[in-house]
């Protein structure tokens, strides 16, 4: 499909993500909760360096209701055996923010050019780049 071709040929990685995840992995458990189908996720992240920082990945096939429903994030909390108060969702979409809030999890939005016009007024935190995340976590 066009979408999979695009994913295979375009570099859509976030600059500096490996360094940020390496720093965070020293103190935090992390997972990816995505609305992508697992097949598309694997196209985006084949043998990707970010996966070894993650305890697990939840893809679209792993849950019944997609974001903005809270189910994906509630499932992640369950897998971590963690209460919402001990979690922070990092999002870049309005639907993801809505899902995090519906699951009663604090959410930090990382700005990107695709979601400039979205309503992120319910986010607890706003980050210009992912590189700001370690400092935010140290401050909270």
Located regions from the model:
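Metal-dependent phosphoesterase signature
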Residues: 1-22
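Short, flexible loop segments at the rims of nucleotide/cofactor-binding pockets, characterized by
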Residues: 7-11, 35, 104
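Asp-based, Mg2+/Mn2+-dependent phosphohydrolase catalytic module
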Residues: 22, 37-140
């Amino acid at each position: 499909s066009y979408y999979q071709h695009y994913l295979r040929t375009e570099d859509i990685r976030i600059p500096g993500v490996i360094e940020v995840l390496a720093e965070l992995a020293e103190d935090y458990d992390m997972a990816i909760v995505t609305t992508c189908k697992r097949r598309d996720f694997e196209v985006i992240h084949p043998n990707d360096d970010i996966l070894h920082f993650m305890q697990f990945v939840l893809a679209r096939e792993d849950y019944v209701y997609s974001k903005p429903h809270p189910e994906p994030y509630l499932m992640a909390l369950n897998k971590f055996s963690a209460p919402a108060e001990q979690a922070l969702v990092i999002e870049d979409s309005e639907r993801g923010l809505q899902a995090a809030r519906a699951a009663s999890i604090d959410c930090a939005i990382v700005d990107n050019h695709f979601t400039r016009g979205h309503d992120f007024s319910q986010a607890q935190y706003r980050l210009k780049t992912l590189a700001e995340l370690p400092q935010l976590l140290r401050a909270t």
